[in-house]
């Protein structure tokens, strides 16, 4: 009955929590020709492009710890030592151990509520909460959740109404760090996230998901700055690859989609329309200082009506294409038609594709093996 108040020092706690699963990154491969992997280049080489943060942490304190503290104090006022109640003072106790094994060390006010600096250890959930208490609630401090091998997950920051509110930091035992804004227990506002592998995100989150403007720097040298929606690249942005390739334009669910410009590291470029990661619609491909193609595209190939010309427009050939092959007699609009007829126009698209393939000859074999996968940025900052 009651609590034991005879302890002179804070009892040692055996912090051993069962392992908590973190959701695996959802990797999906799209085989449909309508949703082609992104532009034969670098965005589709991302593997584990967003390390997962998972449905993790938070409920322990928000729904378990604080209510249990308040409940126990309300139900067991008789367990407090005689002489504790006073109308004018905050009383300091070295340690109070309750019959259920919970331990509190710190200040109390005259209403028998925790006040001032204090530590509370909850035995049944193996959690330690310490910091500044007011009227029985932790308002700023740290919450420790033990992991295997003497490691801890830690929250440090502001707490309001038993939930994380304001500025705070989550430090997970695997090395991942979230630092930024919380609102009613959710990650909401501006933040910086450092992943276990060194990937860094800085930007906005809304209700636990990437949404708004942000920057992502991957450990393999890729950089993105632009708009995020639902944990994915959505809207306008700039994506840079480690070999010097740059895409600037519109994204839809991580894919080049809409109007954009792709500049290769050798100076070649495509500017025009994309659909599901492939060149489709109107666009201009420029082979640096050699030739350009201006016309219709489908599935990354000339398809429809378009014009080939040299860099300075000294000759122009109007062609009808079907997936990279001439299907009608070309019209020689400008230049020496006799000489131009000696050009095998069907090899032009092949040269375009060779340029692209050369650019994807990345030394990292692991990256090569994934360059024809569509890796989706799936669950990242779920509500906890």
Model-derived regions, located:
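Intrinsically disordered, low-complexity repeat tracts enriched in Gly/Pro/Ser/Thr and acidic residues
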Residues: 1-384
């Amino acid at each position: 009955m009651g609590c034991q108040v005879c302890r002179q020092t804070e009892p040692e706690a055996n912090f051993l929590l069962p392992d908590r699963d973190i959701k695996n990154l959802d990797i999906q491969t799209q085989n449909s020709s309508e949703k082609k992997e992104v532009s034969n280049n670098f965005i589709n080489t991302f593997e584990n492009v967003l390390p997962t943060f998972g449905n993790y942490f938070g409920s322990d304190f928000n729904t378990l710890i604080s209510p249990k503290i308040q409940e126990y104090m309300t139900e067991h006022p008789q367990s407090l030592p005689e002489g504790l109640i006073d109308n004018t003072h905050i009383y300091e106790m070295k340690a109070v151990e309750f019959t259920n094994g919970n331990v509190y060390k710190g200040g109390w006010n005259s209403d028998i509520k925790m006040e001032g600096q204090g530590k509370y250890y909850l035995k049944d959930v193996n959690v330690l909460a310490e910091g500044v208490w007011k009227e029985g609630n932790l308002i700023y401090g740290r919450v420790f959740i033990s992991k295997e091998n003497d490691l801890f997950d830690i929250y440090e920051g502001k707490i309001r109404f038993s939930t994380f509110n304001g500025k705070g930091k989550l430090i997970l035992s695997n090395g991942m760090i979230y630092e930024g804004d919380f609102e009613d227990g959710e990650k909401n506002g501006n933040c910086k996230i450092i992943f276990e592998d060194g990937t860094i995100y800085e930007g906005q989150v809304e209700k636990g998901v990437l949404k708004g403007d942000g920057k992502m720097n991957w450990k393999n040298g890729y950089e993105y700055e632009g708009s995020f929606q639902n944990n994915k690249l959505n809207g306008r942005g700039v994506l840079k690859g480690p070999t010097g390739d740059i895409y600037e334009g519109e994204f839809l669910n991580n894919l080049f989609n809409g109007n954009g410009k792709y500049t290769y590291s050798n100076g070649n470029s495509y500017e025009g329309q994309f659909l599901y990661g492939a060149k489709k619609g109107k666009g201009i491909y420029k082979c640096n200082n050699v030739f350009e193609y201006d016309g219709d595209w489908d599935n990354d190939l000339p398809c429809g009506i378009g014009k080939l010309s040299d860099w300075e427009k000294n000759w122009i050939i109007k062609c009808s294409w079907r997936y990279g092959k001439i299907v009608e007699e070309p019209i020689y609009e400008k230049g020496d038609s006799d000489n131009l007829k000696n050009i095998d126009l069907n090899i032009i698209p092949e040269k375009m594709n060779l340029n692209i393939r050369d650019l994807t000859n990345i030394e990292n074999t692991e990256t090569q093996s994934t360059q024809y996968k569509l890796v989706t940025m799936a669950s990242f900052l779920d509500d906890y």
